[in-house]
UniProtKB/Swiss-Prot annotation:
Keywords: Acetylation, Cytoplasm, Nucleus. Pfam families: Isochorismatase. It is found in: Cytoplasm; Nucleus. Coiled coil: none annotated. Ubiquitous. Expressed predominantly in uterus, stomach and urinary tract. Interacts with CDKN2A. This is Isochorismatase domain-containing protein 2A. Belongs to the isochorismatase family.
Length: 206
């Protein structure tokens, strides 16, 4: 029964963590829909703060690729520098110190590189991975689509930001619901997902 429940991919604030991967200045010109995915990642960050979900932020080689973009709203969160195409080695101590952790919500770039490798490492550790599809992108939309399919095939859950936010809050009687409602009432920017998924089979062939 425990395994069956785990396979549903339910998330709770007390056993979840938000990963924000490499949303840095030098990627701005090259990543498809960069402003849009940063905007969605920012709403996930706001909700995580309201619900006391821990947040971890990485930067890939910041000396060359620059700092995290200010519009993410991550001021006050200490970024962890890395060179590996996975967040996990740099965050190993943080993960090891969280015995209640079950679910990781994953946002950032690039989908086929650091997001995919992070997801695989987390799955290998026995954690549930929830890829926030409207908060992840790549330079190539083909890479983005195939990487999402690859993660799903490996056992990750694909979900939109609003779906995950509502799973976290669970109930309109939650004391933070009115604040969260303001966030989800703001229009979600188009990050090209409809055109990306239309007529494609990789997401449905598992």
């Amino acid at each position: 029964m425990a395994a069956a429940r785990a396979s549903l991919g339910r998330i709770l604030p007390e056993s979840s963590i938000l990963f924000l991967c490499d949303l840095q200045e030098k990627f701005r010109p090259s990543i498809a829909y960069f402003p849009q995915i940063v905007s969605v990642a920012a709403r996930m960050l706001k909700v995580a703060r309201l619900l006391d979900v821990p947040i971890l932020l990485t930067e890939q080689y910041p000396e060359g690729l620059g700092p995290t973009v200010p519009e993410l709203g991550a001021q006050g969160i200490r970024p962890v520098s890395k060179t590996c195409f996975s967040m996990v080695p740099a965050l190993q101590k943080e993960l090891d110190g969280r015995s209640q952790l079950q679910s990781v919500l994953l946002c950032g770039i690039e989908t086929q590189a650091c997001i995919l490798n992070t997801a695989l490492d987390l799955l290998h550790r026995g954690l549930q991975v929830h890829v926030v599809v409207d908060a992840c992108s790549s330079r190539s939309q083909v890479d983005r689509l195939v990487a999402l399919a690859r993660m799903r095939q490996s056992g990750a859950f694909l979900a939109t930001s609003e779906s995950l936010i509502l799973q976290l809050v669970r109930d309109a009687s939650h004391p933070q619901f009115k604040e969260i409602q303001k966030i989800i009432k703001e229009p979600v920017p188009d990050s090209g997902l409809l055109s990306l998924f239309q007529g494609q089979s990789p997401l449905t062939s598992c």
